[in-house]
């Protein structure tokens, strides 16, 4: 069976990968997948780094080990069997798995035979009261009850994602039953008393376990139009609060649910709430230079978390979709090309990075298979769906990644060579009469130019796009230094943040390395650098520095995009460089 390609469905995106360019662990995963009936892909062209990232995580979820996502392993949290970590978060892992594969199936046109079996087995374990997992204590809820609510919230979202893929009355019935359970407990839980009782100190079992129900309730309202779910979602949205030290993933998920409620109702109040919260995050001091966010808000800012990075990326994509304000798309791209990519392990997992006191990622070492890996997989569908926007007679190409679209009479495929030469090629397969293609110019691009069928054109819009047209988008990029404190700089090439990795520079590390002084004027590209699918050869360069330990000897370091972490075992990174004042 050919697993080298995908088939697009309406309003979806289809992509493929080039296995020969994958690192050995990922290549082995693809080859192993071909030997099992885990996924059924359809023929279709397309090669590139972005789809390779999707396939890397997809294949890890379907066929990976350490641990393997078997049926019984997934169901342990709805059976409340303590055979693995975090089964008290009842429905968390199982719900994320269902949601990630359902969304991937819709977006990429793939089929996952195991999906229906897991869904049917899950809903068969629902309590008569409507919830899943261990016993729920109505009268005196404790941390385990909040954990159960968290997992049930993720499961509600997963069931609704499955219903969007396959409108199954039994699955929708289970989701409604779970929604009615939330209605039943709402008078107690949607209160300031509960918010105070489960403060940020409770972390993963804090009050965000309740507020994150907005996402599932908004989806349930969209499917049923039952006003009870809309009203409860709206009331919970009023309880969303960014508390010091609280769980970022839970907070951002709550906001995404409020934004979903805006999308389904058109009520600007919810959009205004989310945009105000976005401004608060941006000015909080907790927005990292990688474009990501920490696992916990300050003063507990110690690690990153893949789930939170995915939420921040998805929230910005959603805000751009709702407002068409370029600032949201610019941040989404910064997050994807840096924090999201850096957080993806060579195994396909997502997880945690260690932050220093300045909020800089030093290493990404903890694979969080219990949440982040599946949340990462779910995010690829949103990324792929965001690349093109089809709005009647105008098509927008917003996100320069490998992607396909087939919607409203328009069909096209984008193949990215951005990391090598700054180009993205768009092949138009179908277009309606009078349709126009417009290309977004991101903030990181010095200039964007278009060629249509080999001929340069002026501007960023093409009138009368037609089937058979080949559009090449050229993104001109250069090195930019941005201040980090008074004497240090962070270096960017195009959308990529550059860093000094221990893998590329095995002799660089030392006790005084933070005091090394760099001459930015000596940066030069590295010619002929070996290309692998997760490398960014266009951004790589070398730079001279004065060693704090041996200043009289000339020294040079290699800087690469932090996104290249995916191609390697966990490494240590230096993300900012002190500037040598003597270099001018």
Where is each model-derived feature located?
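C-terminal beta-rich recognition modules with glycine/proline-rich loops and embedded aromatic residues
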Residues: 52, 233, 274, 329-420, ...
